[in-house]
From Swiss-Prot:
Span of the annotated motif 'KMSKS' region: 333-337
Organism lineage: Bacteria, Pseudomonadati, Pseudomonadota, Gammaproteobacteria, Enterobacterales
NCBIfam families: metG, metG_C_term, PRK00133.1
Protein name per Swiss-Prot or TrEMBL: Methionine--tRNA ligase
Naturally occurring in which organism (per UniProt): Salmonella enteritidis PT4 (strain P125109)
GN (gene name): metG
Gene Ontology cellular-component terms listed: cytosol
Catalysed conversion reaction: tRNA(Met) + L-methionine + ATP = L-methionyl-tRNA(Met) + AMP + diphosphate
């Protein structure tokens, strides 16, 4: 039965543009793509979009490390991501970037509306600052102990253990991820989104059916603990969009990231010359449906901040959030050392996309449970289901049809009632696809496949083929088998796009959900060719080994400090023990008249003063900034007479030279004169 066509916009969470796509990412994109392909088969208007999340300090710093601009890095990463998704047949209508004109305009529009409506608040805050790098530290560049559950090694914006969000200043024992230094507090004016104003709306939306029950229950905990205003600004230097009329202030990446859904759709509409669909889909009273597929780690942002931002700026809210769990491999977290941290591109060098699409689909449900990719079970299931049950059904019958009947199917079904049993299952299987009970859909389909194969076993066409005068029976039996195969592949089409294309070529007919009511009768099929190959554990072993080698290659420095300055010849412990390293306090620092390279440092060793000349002037053009700082010096180096005076030691610094010299400093708590061991 044909359904009333709906307008549907589907998104996946935006991959961050500083790393490759791996099998953890692919779970979400496969889940969404299967759902989208089913919706399209049912005749709905579906727009499936995504983009790279391309802003933030991590991208800025990684680009600096690579010696390229952030724009160049995110451009290259976008191409890599799109290639990976295309390789897995993820059928996006558009793949864009948050670093785009569309996203800038929409971010500014939403911010302006929120501000005009009184939902943006300004206040001065004390913020963590890296004294060694001279920069404010974004959330993800501070780590410490979660103030809520006391889990160690958590980022400065939210805890990956308990899901709580907080300010970086609330972290216990924070450390800069950039330098390892203990941050200091500095004041800065920031802009806040008044999330508590939307508490009543959000609680109603939470219980409206827009969220899975597990998510709604978790949100209730957050409501009970009280919503806080959300800091949406970051200080320069920052790679992102500058806030209007606020020089040196930038939108926090999590403000413009979800707006990227809108930006990508706007870009798609503009490409099509479509001037009406954007408003039709995003206006406050839109009757279109909006679905976000996301992982459970970003529920807080999508279930609180995002709908509140949309409500406050007079746009529509999502129809549903579809939240999934994490991927484990062989029962454990993905591991680089074990070779189970597998990139999407690496997978495609060893297996086809349909195999992973099928395995993930067979394990997915509408719940937020984690999915385990057991590689041995993967091989067994793909061979047992796709090869033995489904493809084998076609191969057992196609040969007789091709050879004995010139590829023409019988004019009537051998068992109309059995065929009706298969087509009647469309309601149950369709509902399972619709409700994202993918595992249930696969179980129903494979149960039918068992029935179809039993039918062929019982009818034994290979026996009938040898009996004189039974050509009509043989044609009817094999035609029945091929028609049952057609129904099964129609149900599996959202999952197995590549195999489906081969099947359509063989059947000489499109796999169409509504068309299965009518079997293929007196229809000519094409010559049968192998549709799918068995897989084995040797491929798995090669995949795991290749992943290990990629990790080794990534860890090996092709260029950089070790390549430019190889480690010196090995010394003995006794040689090293002769060097006396001490903590020193810089009491004074000044230029040396007549030298453009040296600074004169007066060092306090805790009761003894030293005069040291150091060639660090190019890196520290303001020597006064060094006063009061601690460093490390070689205290037992023989005094050296220089043109400007006597140098009584050497301070320790890293870097290749020039402006890239970095004076070493001990952690807080070290005292002048203490020995460095």
């Amino acid at each position: 039965m044909t359904q009333v066509a709906k307008k549907i916009l589907v998104t996946c969470a935006l991959p961050y543009a500083n790393g490759s796509i791996h099998l953890g990412h692919m779970l979400e994109h496969i889940q969404a793509d299967v759902w989208v392909r089913y919706q399209r088969m049912r005749g709905h208007e579906v727009n499936f979009i995504c983009a790279d999340d391309a802003h933030g300090t991590p991208i800025m710093l990684k680009a600096q490390q690579l010696g390229i601009t952030p724009e160049q890095m995110i451009g290259e990463m976008s191409q890599e991501h799109q290639t990976d998704f295309a390789g897995f047949n993820i059928s996006y209508d558009n793949y864009h970037s948050t670093h785009s004109d569309e996203n800038r305009e929409l971010s500014e529009l939403i911010y302006t509306r929120l501000k005009e409506n009184g939902f943006i608040k300004n206040r001065t805050i004390s913020q963590l600052y890296d004294p060694e790098k001279g920069m404010f530290l974004p959330d993800r560049f501070v780590k410490g102990t979660c103030p809520k559950c006391k889990s160690a090694d958590q980022y400065g914006d939210n805890c990956e253990v308990c899901g709580a969000t907080y300010s970086p200043t609330e972290l216990i024992e924070p450390k800069s991820v950039v330098s390892g230094a203990t941050p200091v507090m500095r004041d800065s004016e920031h802009f806040f989104f008044d999330l508590p104003s939307f508490s009543e709306m959000l609680q109603a939306w939470t219980r409206s059916g827009a969220l899975q029950e597990q998510v709604a229950n978790k949100m209730q905990e957050w409501f009970e603990s009280g919503l806080q205003q959300w800091d949406i600004s970051r200080d320069a230097p920052y790679f992102g969009f500058e806030i209007p009329n606020a020089p040196g202030k930038y939108f926090y990446v999590w403000l413009d990231a979800p707006i990227g859904y809108m930006g990508s759709f706007k870009n798609l509409c503009d490409k099509r010359g479509d001037t009406t669909s954007f408003d039709e889909y995003w206006k406050k009273d839109s009757d279109a449906e909006l679905y976000h597929f996301i992982g459970k780690d970003i529920v807080y942002f999508h279930s609180l901040f995002w709908p509140a931002m949309l409500e406050g700026s007079h746009f529509r809210k999502p129809t549903n959030l579809f939240v999934h769990g994490y991927v484990t491999v062989n029962g454990a977290k993905m591991s680089k050392s074990r070779g189970t941290f597998i990139k999407a591109s690496t997978w495609l060098k060893h297996f086809d996309a349909d195999s992973l699409r099928y395995y993930y689909t067979a394990k997915l449900s509408s719940r937020i449970d984690d999915i385990d990719l057991n590689l041995e079970d993967f091989v067994q299931r793909v061979n047992a289901d796709i090869v033995n049950k489904v493809v084998n059904l076609a191969s057992r019958n196609a040969g007789f049809i091709n050879k004995r009947f010139d590829g023409v199917l019988a004019a009537e079904l051998a068992d109309p009632q059995l065929y009706k049993t298969f087509t009647d299952a469309a309601a149950v299987i369709g509902e399972a696809w619709e409700s994202r009970e993918f595992g249930k859909a696969i179980r129903e389909i494979m149960a039918l496949a068992d029935v179809a194969n039993r039918y062929v076993d019982e009818q034994a066409p290979w026996v009938v083929a040898k009996q004189e005068g039974r050509d009509a029976d043989l044609q009817a039996i094999c035609s029945m088998g091929i028609n049952l195969f057609r129904v099964l592949m129609t149900y599996l089409k959202p999952v197995l796009p590549t195999l489906s294309e081969r099947v359509e070529a063989f059947l000489n007919s499109e796999l169409n959900w509504d068309a299965i009511e009518q079997p293929l009768l007196s229809h000519k099929v094409n010559t049968f060719k192998a549709l799918y190959n068995r897989i084995d554990m040797k491929q798995v072993e090669a995949l795991v080994e290749a992943s290990k080698e990629e990790v080794k290659a990534a860890a090996a420095p092709v260029t950089g400090p070790l390549a430019d300055f190889p480690i010196q010849e090995t010394i003995t412990f006794d040689d090293f023990a002769k060097i006396d390293l001490r903590v020193a306090l810089i009491e004074n620092a000044e230029f040396v008249e007549g030298s453009d390279k040296l600074l004169r440092l007066t060092l306090d060793l805790g009761g003894e003063k030293r005069n040291v000349f150091s060639g660090i002037r190019s890196a520290y053009p303001d020597p006064q900034a060094l006063i009061g700082r601690q460093t490390v010096m070689v205290a037992n180096l023989a005094p050296r007479k220089m043109r400007f005076g006597v140098s009584e030691g050497m301070v320790m610094a890293a870097g290749p030279g020039g402006k890239d010299i970095f004076l070493l400093s001990p952690d807080d708590g070290a005292k002048p004169g203490q020995q460095v061991k």
